[in-house]
């Protein structure tokens, strides 16, 4: 189970939860509400090195396709195959069981530029 107590957010509507140098990443509830029912998810390969801002995942809904960006630099160490098989998991639990991938952080200092829950709620109004 993902602890949402220390969750951080990006302005691109990703969430990140870091435990022991590994970041779990997904899209926010707000993002999945804007996209609507998800029908396809393209996950990255484990072992891929990504830089902050790189498009890492593609999510497709009946409305649109959207990239999910890396919130920090790191190496993909795990992907959530369950969401590739059943994208509706993201609609059901975007900030929980609908997580997308996990990154081994390259620089924890990059976390300081992310938003806390109050900052994100202010962003989305």
UniProtKB/Swiss-Prot annotation:
Keywords: Lipoyl
Pfam families: GCV_H
Residue ranges of coiled coil: none
Domain Lipoyl-binding: 22-104
NCBIfam families named in the record: gcvH, PRK01202.1
Functional note: The glycine cleavage system catalyzes the degradation of glycine. The H protein shuttles the methylamine group of glycine from the P protein to the T protein.
Entry's family note: Belongs to the GcvH family.
UniProt name for this protein: Glycine cleavage system H protein
Lineage, highest ranks first: Bacteria, Pseudomonadati, Pseudomonadota, Alphaproteobacteria, Hyphomicrobiales
